[in-house]
Amino acid sequence: MDQAKLARMQASVRIGTFCSFLWIFEVLESESVFSADGFQAHHLGNVIGKGTPRRKVKKVHKSSGADDKKLQTTLKKMNVQPIQAIEEVNMFKEDGNVIHFAAPKVHASVPSNTFALYGNGEEKELTELVPGILNQLGPDSLASLRKLAESYQNMQKQAGAEGKKDEDEDDIPDLVEGENFESNVE
């Protein structure tokens, strides 16, 4: 291949993109894409040319519906029955807090000793729920509630005692560098 033929081929074919970018910005300036309000990007689509549009990434959200369906089929195998007219469910924890379910869906299977609760549980302190739940409790529950209240009070006392220990430590002065207080005692 001779040099003249190679030069003609290179002239006919665009090699590189630098020239095309210069051409784009010259066209943009001539079309007043840069206005007083700022850069208007919608003009770029007309100038740049053909191409495939950007495709949005499809996000797959894993729904809890599939988990609920699996749970429902398992509960059907256990022959659970829905229990109606339950307004709230409270689960007492050892640390004195309560998991409170307002208007839950409850299913039960007495032969297999299985109960299922559906709903949003909120963790609340025992003191928030005490006035409203006292009339719902039986004698056995009242005894366990007393034990729970005692443990809650003990926890509060321990937390208060730890706070006082921290206050006592604040009264002790820090040693100043270079001074030795033991030599003064002797």
Swiss-Prot record:
InterPro entries registered for this protein in UniProt: BTF3, NAC_A/B_dom_sf, Nas_poly-pep-assoc_cplx_dom
Keywords: Cytoplasm, Nucleus, Protein transport, Repressor, Transcription, Transcription regulation, Transport
Residue span, NAC-A/B domain: 65-130
GO process annotations (BP): protein transport
Protein transport keyword on record: yes
Keyword DNA damage belongs to the record: no
PROSITE patterns found in the cross-reference section: NAC_AB
Biased segments, Acidic residues type: 167-186
Name of one Pfam family that matches: NAC
Entry GO terms, CC: cytosol; nascent polypeptide-associated complex; nucleus
Region (Disordered): 153-186
Role description: Component of the nascent polypeptide-associated complex (NAC), a dynamic component of the ribosomal exit tunnel, protecting the emerging polypeptides from interaction with other cytoplasmic proteins to ensure appropriate nascent protein targeting. The NAC complex also promotes mitochondrial protein import by enhancing productive ribosome interactions with the outer mitochondrial membrane and blocks the inappropriate interaction of ribosomes translating non-secretory nascent polypeptides with translocation sites in the membrane of the endoplasmic reticulum.
PANTHER family: TRANSCRIPTION FACTOR BTF3 FAMILY MEMBER
Family classification: Belongs to the NAC-beta family.
Protein name in UniProt: Nascent polypeptide-associated complex subunit beta
Species: Aspergillus fumigatus (strain ATCC MYA-4609 / CBS 101355 / FGSC A1100 / Af293) (Neosartorya fumigata)
Designated gene of the protein: egd1
